[in-house]
Amino acid sequence: MIELLKEDDAPKKIGHIQFGLLSEDDIVRLSHVQIVNRELFDLVKRKPTPYGVLDNKLGTSDKQAMCTTCGLSIVDCVGHFGYIKLQLPVFHIGYLKNIMNILQMICKSCSTILLNEEKKQYYLRKMRNKKMDNLQRKSLLKKIFLECRKTKECLKCGSTNGMIKKSGAFKIIHEKYKGKTESLQDYYALYDDAIKYNPEMKSHIKKAQDDLNPLVALNLFKKISYQDIEIMNMDPVIGRPERLILTYMLVPPVSIRPSVPMDGGSGTNEDDLTMKLSEILHINEHIRSNVDRAEMSAIMEDWDYLQASCAIYINSDVPGLPLQMKPTKAVRGLSQRLKGKTGRFRGNLSGKRVDFSGRTVISPDPNLNIDEVAVPQLIALTMTYPERVTDYNIERLQKYVINGPDRHPGANYIIYADGVKKWLKFGNREKFAAELKIGDIVERHIIDGDIMLFNRQPSLHKLSIMSHKARVMPWRTLRFNECVCTPYNADFDGDEMNIHLPQTEEARAEATILMGVTNNLITPRNGEPLVAATQDFLTASYLISRRDAFYERYRFALMCTHFADANEHIDLPPPAILKPVELWTGKQIFEVLLRPSVKSHVLCNFETRSRTYSKNLYMCPKDGYVYFRNSELMCGSIDKSIIGGGNKNSLFHILMRDFSPTIAANCMTRLAKLCARFLGDQGFSIGIPDIKPAEDLDRKKREIIETAYKKCAVFLKDYESGSLQLSSGCSMEQTFEAKMNQTLSQIRDDCGKLCVNDLPNYNSPLIMGLCGSKGSNINIAQMICCVGQQIVNGTRIPNGFTNRTTPHFKHFAKNPKSKGFVSNSFYTGMIPTEFFFHTMGGREGLVDTAVKTAETGYMQRRLMKALEDLSTHYDYTVRDSIGGIVQFIYGDDGLDPAGMEAKDRPVDFLRAMMSVKSTRQCRNEPEMKPFEIRKLVESIIDSSKFEACTDLFKNEIRVFFNGNEKTKGYIQELISLRKQFKLSSFDLNDNEDEIIIEDNSPMDISTTTTTTTTTTTNNAVKITNITTDIEMNESNKEENDKIEKERIEKEKESKRLKLLGERFANEHVVNQIHRITKTQIELFLDICLDKYSRARIEPGTAVGAIGAQSIGEPGTQMTLKTFHFAGVASMNVTLGVPRIKEIINAAKNISTPIITASLNCDYDIRSARIVAGRIEKTTLGHVATHIKEVVKRAGCYLSIKIDKNFVDSLQLEINSKTISQSIASTKGLKLKPEQITTNGDYKLRIVPPANIREGSLYYLQFLKNNLPAVIVKGIPTVNRVVISKVDEKQERYQLLVEGYDLRAVMATPGIKGTHTTSNHIMECENTLGIETARNTIMSEIDMIMTSHGMSIDIRHVMLLADLMSFKGEILGITRFGIAKMKESVLMLASFEKTTDHLFDAAVHHRQDDIVGVSECIIMGVVIPLGTGLFKLLRKSNKNNLPKKSLLLQD
């Protein structure tokens, strides 16, 4: 019989979630039983009590028991709800604020909203507008609330309405009787007689309040009209206000509050919710039994207890609970189960524990490929992959089934087509294998080549989880190639890592393409390579490629086999030295490594300076200029800058960009194998002899320290005598410390240079430092020479004892040794005081790291939450999850930061041209002239194939060829080079074959050549004749003079001939190198177009998440310190994590607000001082020599004298008149202008008023204390102004203003307002608008990253700035800012203030459409990013489609 109807078990996608409030009927309808019994268990039957909070109708938590409602066991029954009917209504603690707001908005007598009819209709129309988003509705509701609060009398019934306030934890009072309205006067008149007999009553009448208990509030809410409810942004059908007050309570299923049996069966441990529900039932029963017979006070007390118990059940952290109502032990309410890191949202919905994962310690294995991970056999036997049986794999899977679960490669389970699952531990496996059919699923062991996700926590960026291919190996650790350490930030000192096994073919495909190591060699932060050679590999590469590294044939061939697989064909290059014995250089190893066979198409071309470069390019004495031509290493030693990470000019980055990531990964694998074997065979170690300084080195070190000590002694002497020249804006102390710090810190750097120059070439620490594998010059200097000055918080060691650092030194000692200078090295060992200072310096680093981890972790979480759902769409816009446009085109050019070859640009034109000219010589083609080059370039750029490119990119190509005001173009370089060699050159606009010689006159080449030849012949004849004449007429003096004269002429002629010969010889060489043909230009432009196309951002890219990680991840490498402003020791500026935190928080108050002000007259220091005086806050206390009281018989007054010298030295534009105006305008002093008299320019007199209440002398004391703080000049919010040099070479100045009020600074005479900037984002927004604030965010973050030596693509910063400003105001990435940016309830609930957002959503009937990242993860829906952005339509056969019936057809 055919099954007509089959139950559809296919999972449905949840379209949206509607939040609302449950009515009494809804609660009863949802429930299966009313709970009335407070007893938990029937002690006789040892079963849950019927109608109790553990009734089996609610489900079961016992493995043996069955649910009496659905008849299922604990595994299948999800549980059922019950309800408790409360005898008296209580406030829902989650809605208490909403209840108070509604009570404030309505009349407390007739329940009408406190608005007139006109406004009511206006706001109703607004609220019914479907286009308004939640943020606008919230803003409108706030406006309505404020308007209602101002209304004191109801416009309908005339009742008085006052303020609604909260009293205690959950009592609401109505201050009805405060105010002076007519109705209140009538109310007070009622008590006139009572006051006569009891006068004390008068003070209490105005304190009278209405107690709005839940019963009163419930009755008021029931009377609110439908229209008024809509105005309050609530739903009149599913969200009426009376539902905010609890009359019925839902009892959750037993499965979420299970009973845990105690050992020995002596009882159970009950959940907090169960006990609280039992307590509510008990109080409820007590109220029911006492409601008719008990006193009102007893009932009210029980009611309060019921309210408290219900509140604690919902939220156990209720503030303001009376002591007697507080639970004796901590209780976890419903809110506590949802919020926090371990709550339901973050702990179980947004992130959860997974199956098919493993974790163990990691260790290195250089013989593995870059994209492989060695999986221990123990893990491979446990983790399985469900492979479906097909015609192609049935034989292999049959073998796995026969091997079973204990033998690798085997299988653990078979899942048949009918859903039956069979374990292969027992039974006849041969039979099972024979019965295997197409379509069955075999859960087999991990085998070589399986795709696995590899992850190390903390996962700070995208590259912290990548996919590798499994390689099953013995032993118990996960192993991988050390080149992949950097993206994971892994080391092998005991780190553990996780592996995950994707369970579907689709997941494997996505993991391979999107997360594969080969496809993620570069970081999306800035396009630099992260997967690269490291440590030992760098040391070995440096040793192999050094000068004078020669290998005989057998050794060279052996080294080639080290990096090659057995089946790889290798062609040895010709030896560098043929006689007396064939020798190959170490540089040739790299040639074979890049291009093992001559058939390989990998022709790598680039040149760069390595770490050891000193001078003379190719002839660098330290072999520091690396030149690769067609994959041959011509010169240079290989070090970190060539094969390490973080450098766009590195070998692997160029291989990846010019060829493919696979070729780069293969070369990296070969290098790892070679270096590991090379160091294993040759050996490389470090020991005590390596760091033992030679006598000469020790002597030079002592000389350096003595010289520095002498300088310090001079500074100390000048400081003590007061003759030290002050730095700009610094005190004597600050200047002295800055100079000492600079001098002593320089010692360590000098010692580092000394070590590099004096240590032998074979010194191991030196080799590691030079090649960049480990350590630096400073580390070497500390080991061998001197540990150096210890710094704590940016300064020398502060005084810990009374006026000294430790008791070992004299009081007020400031010499180097007493303030933390360590002259010994680690080799010689430190004395106790030096060791103590050294620990202080080290401790600061440890504390800084510990604090920084928590700070950056929270910062990155906030960034991720704000940016996670931003992605590029098919129109290249960047939108959020609800379709709001954040950027019209990503990064203003639509390019991917990961595809940037040059600094923020997609093509490195110079290197691309070099590569083209090296690989395509085109010797038979004629060279192109400048006007031809320009014409060809323009025609290709304007053609159809460049249509997809932006104008910006096209202009970059034009600038590369033609140049602009700032840079010389390629054509100009070509011409200037020919001129440099004194060759024929072409003018940029010439169209004819003209040659320009020294005298700039045109000349035909053939004529020049003929003339030269003739002249040479004639000269030869002349020379012969002269020699003959000398022999014949030696005695003749006149003849001798003539001969001498002709000899001089002959030398001049030969020099000219030599110069001309060199010129034509050079021309041939230069023409071959510095020429360009049509084919080369066409190929160059094709390469540029190809690279540009690859660099375009793909639609669906999660640019928001990548941007958040790119900004957050470098934060871990920053510090928490405050640094000095460049060039000004005293001007501190906050950098690092605290500054980024200020920026993304959009903080209104920042730690170091600095306005950089340009001057109209920026070359005159006197003018700068005058303008600084106008800005800097100057008080009367600063400029007055004295403020003293004068008492005479005629009266008393205050005498003020101004310090003329001080005013003149600071160029202050003040006198007694301006000061008197400032004093008179100061609030709080209560002085009138006529009370202040002036005597000349520098004296004032203040007379107290005659009718002063407290007496003249007291008033004078008051003035004397407050007058020094009166601001007489400058901007009140500016603390100080420092004059700094813009450029050290040119005497140009600018002002650094510490403080706020950008507008006032810009308006100050002498300031160039258009060139004045502030680092305060909110002030920029208020003064200059949102666009300036956006640019400030970008420039500030870029400055912070640059100051820490980090590079971050500007597109990431741009996206953050656009997100913070796209709503029309600057919103911080905080819980308040994100709430204004985002609409989704689930997303906001999964971030912070979980229950607040849920309660608010319920009150205002919010709807969550589940389109953002967080919501989709919570609900198990495909995220609409990347491969989830689009849907596929299957192409169907039109002939098989059913015919559609016509509209009016029956």
Swiss-Prot record:
Transmembrane segments: none annotated. GO terms for biological process: transcription by RNA polymerase III. Pfam families: RNA_pol_Rpb1_1 (PF04997), RNA_pol_Rpb1_2 (PF00623), RNA_pol_Rpb1_3 (PF04983), RNA_pol_Rpb1_4 (PF05000), RNA_pol_Rpb1_5 (PF04998). Mg(2+) binds at residues 491, 493, 495. Disulfide bonds: none annotated. SUPFAM superfamilies: beta and beta-prime subunits of DNA dependent RNA-polymerase (SSF64484). One of its GO terms (cellular component) is mitochondrion. It comes from the Eukaryota. Residues 832-844 are annotated as: Bridging helix. It catalyses: RNA(n) + a ribonucleoside 5'-triphosphate = RNA(n+1) + diphosphate. Its EC number is 2.7.7.6. InterPro entries: RNA_pol_asu, RNA_pol_N, RNA_pol_Rpb1_1, RNA_pol_Rpb1_3, RNA_pol_Rpb1_3_sf, RNA_pol_Rpb1_4, RNA_pol_Rpb1_5, RNA_pol_Rpb1_clamp_domain. Belongs to the RNA polymerase beta' chain family. Component of the RNA polymerase III (Pol III) complex consisting of 17 subunits. This is DNA-directed RNA polymerase III subunit rpc1. It comes from Dictyostelium discoideum. The lineage of its organism: Eukaryota, Amoebozoa, Evosea, Eumycetozoa, Dictyostelia. The gene is polr3a.
